[in-house]
């Protein structure tokens, strides 16, 4: 799903980071999820997804309706 979106080297590095059994860091995953899930509902709603780029930079644009469907 990320092929063509992320660089192959980045995908390989992410997979290598949790290649060993029991090495997946769920705390890091949920930290990232919590940043996007701004209302802490346990779901990422469309309105939160629209603001996804702003988690990287406050001045980033909001995604359009078409981009979040």
UniProtKB/Swiss-Prot annotation:
A Pfam family assignment: EF-hand_6
Gene3D superfamilies for the chain: EF-hand
Keyword Protein biosynthesis assigned: no
Cellular component aspect of the GO annotation: cytoplasm
Gene Ontology molecular function, alphabetical: calcium ion binding
InterPro entries per UniProt: EF-hand-dom_pair, EF_Hand_1_Ca_BS, EF_hand_dom, Parvalbumin
Lineage, uppermost ranks: Eukaryota, Metazoa, Chordata, Craniata, Vertebrata
Record-annotated EF-hand domain positions: 24-59
Protein known as: Parvalbumin beta 4
Keywords: Acetylation, Allergen, Calcium, Metal-binding, Muscle protein
Residues carrying N-acetylalanine: 1
Residues the record lists as binding Ca(2+): 37, 39, 41, 43, 45, 48
Family statement drawn from the similarity comment of this UniProt entry: Belongs to the parvalbumin family.
Note: Is regarded as an important allergen. On the 2D-gel the determined pI of this protein is: 4.02, its MW is: 11.39 kDa.
Keyword presence, Acetylation: yes
Main function: In muscle, parvalbumin is thought to be involved in relaxation after contraction. It binds two calcium ions.
């Amino acid at each position: 799903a990320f092929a063509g979106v992320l660089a192959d080297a980045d995908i390989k590095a992410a997979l290598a980071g949790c290649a060993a059994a029991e090495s997946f860091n769920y705390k890091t995953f949920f930290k990232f999820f919590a940043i996007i899930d701004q209302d802490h509902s346990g779901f990422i709603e469309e309105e939160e997804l629209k603001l996804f780029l702003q988690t990287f930079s406050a001045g980033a644009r909001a995604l359009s309706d078409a981009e979040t469907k």
